[in-house]
Amino acid sequence: MQIDSFKVEDWMNEYEKYSKYDLGNTTVNTMSLEELFELSGENKENFLNSLCALKQGYGFIKGNPELKKGIAKLYKTVEEGHILTTIGAAGANHLVFYSLVEPSDRVISLIPTYQQLYSIPASFCSDAVVLKLKKENGFLPDLDELKNLITPNTKLICINNPNNPTGALMPLGMLEQIAQIADKAGAYILSDEVYRGLSPDEEKMPSMADIYEKGISVCSMSKVFSLAGLRLGWIACRDEAAIETFVRHREYNMISCSVTDESIASLALKNSDRIIKRNCTAVRECLEVLDKWINSSKHFSYVKPRAGTTAMVYYDFDMPSEILCDRLAKEKGVFLTPGCCFEEENCFRVGFCKSPDVLQQGLDKISEFVQNYLTF
């Protein structure tokens, strides 16, 4: 089976080594276990003693019950039996495609987005199509265009909300309309929600798993909870037939998740409100820095992100995004992701949730480079 190179991952693997100012990664101030204990107020000694005593077997095949209880609290209608743990959100997305999609099915994906959501279906589905999100529409989908892409063989509509790389956020009404479109077609909706809950104003964001019975919401401990090292994600879906299908396919490639990872994640989710509040504060402070820089610049523009930790920044001079980001990395130590990794040009993605000082320094280096480039 042929599949396209994962452009973002290839780029990050190659250019992260140049990073003095990391504006490429999109997690929020990754936490250590020490920081997790400080934030939660949990007794570190008691927890570590229980962790050391934990038998390193396969654990609970469908996920630790305490963890699933914590995950269920992130939704309105999702229960513990509707949840299946996976190895990261990437593992969850892959499992959904592998379990549901037949070669003759139509899969509709929105771009720009996380490449996994369109390259995997394109690799084994003969009828994979994309709907282009446009800057002039605030990177929100044109629902008339979506309706026109629906065919009798449509199996799955893939969305990413909040959107990576643009930071666009679909409101509840739009999500409900997408659910209605899918329902008429008898299709599932895969909603990658790894940034759900991260916004400057701590806005409560709806989940597709709550809106639509055949909605499949994917999330993880990586972005919202700053614990990417756990490599733990999940699927939330109220459609029992889909969950049974996911379990059946999951048994062939992972069996279960790490009992250690699930125990730490359970601790974190007991304190989810505190972690989300911490991270929304970081989003707000860093977005203020980015927005001020954009507004003071002659050469850069963006659609201000509504949620998440990423922004797509456009520039008005003639240089391919790959060359610009290559030079910024090697000459200025600024690590960015070029727009070409998202099928876009004359732009780059900024992962803006760093310390405000590092973010400001990195943005200043970009300005310095552009000023020198345009002078010659």
Across the structure, where does each feature detected by a protein language model lie?
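Active-site phosphate-binding strand-loop segment of PLP-dependent enzymes
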Residues: 135-203
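Active-site PLP attachment segment
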Residues: 210-244
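N-terminal small-domain helix-loop-helix segment of the aminotransferase-like
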Residues: 1-88, 268, 372-376
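PLP-dependent enzyme catalytic core of the Aspartate aminotransferase-like
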Residues: 77, 108, 147-148, 318, ...
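Helix C-cap/helix->beta junction micro-motif
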Residues: 124, 184-185, 297, 332, ...
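Conserved glycine-rich beta-strand-loop-beta hairpin in the small C-terminal domain of fold type I
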Residues: 266, 282-291, 302-315
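Structural signature of PLP-dependent enzymes
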Residues: 243-250, 268-291
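Conserved PLP-anchoring active-site segment centered on the Schiff-base-forming lysine
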Residues: 99-121
